[in-house]
Amino acid sequence: MSDKLPWIIKYRPKRVEDVVDQEEAKKLFLPWLRSWLQGRIPERKAALFYGPAGVGKTSLVEAAANEYGLELIEMNASDFRRKSDIERIAKIAATQFSLFGRKRKIILLDEVDGISGTADRGGLDAILELINITKHPIVMTANDPWDQKLKPLRDASLMVPFYRLSERYVVQVLKRICAAENIECEDEALKLIAQRAEGDLRSAINDLQAIAEGYGVVRVDLVRALLATRDRQYSPWEMLRNLFMSKYIWQAKRAVTHTDLDYDTLLQWINENIAVQYTHPEDIWRAHEALARADIFLGRIKRSLSWDLLPYVFDLVGPGVALARKKSKFKWAKYQFPQKILMLAKTKEVREIREAVAEVFAKRLHTSKATVKREVLPFLFIIFRERPDYAARIAIGYNLTDNMIKYLAGPLASKVKEHMNALLMRLEKPATVSTATTATTARTTAAETSVAASRAAKRTSTSRRRTSKSRRRGKGSGTQTTLF
């Protein structure tokens, strides 16, 4: 322990080969960097390093700059907030060579996922502008590059994934540091540090330095006493990687229980990527069988609130899926975002309008929204797309909004609105016209009543005269009858 310099800086990799357990990242990054150095500007002028913290993203850039003799210009996301900073960085990116001779440069933009696309002035637009004008390679780092706001950066960059380091490589680095610092250490203690760091080499080195400088020795009992287990929450991609790499039940179970995904979304992620990771049909069948059984248990939990069944769900989606791999070899695969979730996101607005339409008709028809969607909506679609005139009456009567009309009528929405306007104009005629019409009708009715009354009077008078004559004849005929 010759000085007080933090070990993560003192033992930072000086060469590319010193960056351990990131071979895939090296295979993608180094050819891209060499094309810059050879004067062949690649199609994608920037590279985006993404992965969990402490796995070597920044270290690989620094090691490459040192090995290839490049001037490293390192900036954080906070440097992209003011216009003056953006202009300064733009000048650096547009300058061909360094002030210190003809030395090439490499630009490192750290933690770009911390930039707000709306709040920070410049922000992502400034980075995209730098990528367009740069004459030097630009490398960006991010822990989670899958935020929607970072999509323009993903499209403009070479995506370079970094993964959590294996326990074996972390232990090797810790052993080298202990040897260089003349620290007495136990192998089991180093393994315990590596396990609790969970692939984060930076955390492991910091833990090692804290124990070594405090006690002068690294023993198992000290590690257990001083280091609490880090309760990490895995991202979806980390969860999948850890799940499919699991060799033991506890590893698989830990992968699915240490994530912020809800139960349904967890099943969607695993279901989407089983066929991506597994290649043998029998392995795929076994994994989907376990997932289907987990879905059954989850359905029972929702219906009966029997949360005591939840451990069975985790046993099936974790060990059940992980141990289904018998014949497929593990491979580094690009996992996919669940298509069902993407479709739900794309159709969110349509589904909201559908719910609003169902609610309007359910209130007026005194039924449930489910009944409206099942029994009424199909007929509404037909009416609105076949008979715009009838649809206009329904739209006015139920006070439907423009979005509701567009949803029901589709391309005929404009015709429905034309009929609505015509109908409303007819209903909104001036009141004087109605009064005049009513007066005319009243006069006509009165005249007709007068004529009818006159005719009735004449019929009554005629009837009376006929009755009088009949009576006189009746009396005469009675006398004659008596005489005979």
UniProtKB/Swiss-Prot annotation:
Keywords: ATP-binding, DNA replication, Nucleotide-binding
Ranges annotated as biased composition (Basic residues): 456-475
CDD domains the record matches: AAA (cd00009), HLD_clamp_RFC (cd18140)
GO MF entries: ATP binding; ATP hydrolysis activity; DNA clamp loader activity
Cross-referenced SUPFAM superfamilies: P-loop containing nucleoside triphosphate hydrolases
Record text on subunit structure and interactions: Heteromultimer composed of small subunits (RfcS) and large subunits (RfcL).
Recorded family membership: Belongs to the activator 1 small subunits family. RfcL subfamily.
Protein's job: Part of the RFC clamp loader complex which loads the PCNA sliding clamp onto DNA.
Descriptive protein name: Replication factor C large subunit
Gene encoding the protein: rfcL
